């Protein structure tokens, strides 16, 4: 008898939920919660680093990312180089 009442209750509940209207909330808090976890974590980390760098000063020197930095490979050298055999087969 209880098993027959369960589908009826579920149908009534689903109909009731479909008739409810969600009221939009206009708040800054809700806008902040829309971002996904990775974006929020990245933004929080960036904000934390900006705040702490003002207090502690620069711990590491800035990274040189220009076109003449050490480690930039010349494509001609890469093409002329032979295959690398690290492991004997």
Curated annotation (Swiss-Prot):
Keyword Disulfide bond found: yes
Membrane-spanning residues: none
Protein location: Secreted
Propeptide: 23-31, 74-89
Chain positions found as Tyrosine amide: 70
Single Gene Ontology BP annotation: bone resorption
Signal peptide interval: 1-22
Gene3D superfamilies, per the entry: 6.10.250.2190
The entry's keywords: Amidation, Amyloid, Cleavage on pair of basic residues, Disulfide bond, Hormone, Secreted, Signal
Gene Ontology molecular function, alphabetical: hormone activity; identical protein binding; receptor ligand activity
Function field: Amylin/IAPP is a glucoregulatory peptide hormone that plays an important role in the regulation of energy homeostasis. Selectively inhibits insulin-stimulated glucose utilization and glycogen deposition in muscle, while not affecting adipocyte glucose metabolism. IAPP function is mediated by the CALCR-RAMPs (AMYRs) receptor complexes. Amylin can also bind CALCR receptor in the absence of RAMPs, although it is more selective for AMYRs.
Subunit structure: Can form homodimers. Interacts with IDE and INS. Interaction with INS inhibits homodimerization and fibril formation.
Name by which UniProt lists this protein: Islet amyloid polypeptide
């Amino acid at each position: 008898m209880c098993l027959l009442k369960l589908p009826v209750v579920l149908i009534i509940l689903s109909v009731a939920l479909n008739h409810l209207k969600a009221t939009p909330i206009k708040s800054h808090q809700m806008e902040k919660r829309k971002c996904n976890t990775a974006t929020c974590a990245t933004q929080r980390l960036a904000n934390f680093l900006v705040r702490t760098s003002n207090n502690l000063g620069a711990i590491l020197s800035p990274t040189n990312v220009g076109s003449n930095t050490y480690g930039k490979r010349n494509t001609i050298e890469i093409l002329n180089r032979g295959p690398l055999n690290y492991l004997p087969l």
